[in-house]
Amino acid sequence: GSSGAGKSTLMAVIAGELTPREGMIRSQPHAWLSQRTDLFQDSLRDNLLLASPEATDASLWHALEAAGLASGIRGLQAGLDTRLGEGGLGLSGGQLRRLALARLLLQPHPLWLLDEPTEGLDAATARDVLARLDALGAGRAWLIATHLQREAALADRLLVLRSGRVEAEYSRGSAGFGAALAALRPD
């Protein structure tokens, strides 16, 4: 759906961050990658541990490697102890999304909720993040809220939202799938 169609609201309801006005939502345990990546004035380690408080340093490095952020962090004098946020290291938009991806990967949940996971990233960074999600998301169910072709192209099914309602549904290989994909914003 387009901007304002209700995609992010639907995702927030499924994630349990908003209460539906009517009816009820039941969801599997899930990992939630929202549009906003919160960066706390703390160490990189503690920013990652928000996703999995019991994670070992080895697990943190594995998630950073999988997210494409490890080499940059290894180059920092303090490594995982590098301070982030005000008074510490600032991260670019691409690095923030990769940090969010590392947090996602630290959670072993069977469902991923991804709200515009590459919005605002340059094309090369977006392709890399999506390739990593595709490779690491095997065996999980994904729900992606997007208006971008590059993100929707990963889907097996497309739901088209307008004004908060599902207007259409297409399965990969069906007659309308390609047209629905083409109607989304190109890279």
Predicted regions and their residues:
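Helix-to-loop junction immediately C-terminal to a conserved catalytic motif
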Residues: 15
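ABC ATPase nucleotide-binding domain helical subdomain, centered on the C-loop/LSGGQ "ABC signature"
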Residues: 45-85, 130-131
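Hydrophobic anchor residue at the start of the ABC signature
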Residues: 101
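Catalytic Walker B motif of ABC-type/P-loop ATPase nucleotide-binding domains
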Residues: 112-116
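Helix N-cap at the start of a conserved alpha-helix in ABC-type nucleotide-binding domains
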Residues: 123-124
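Conserved catalytic loops of ABC-family nucleotide-binding domains
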Residues: 132-144, 152
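Conserved beta-strand-loop-alpha-helix hinge in the C-terminal portion
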Residues: 165-187
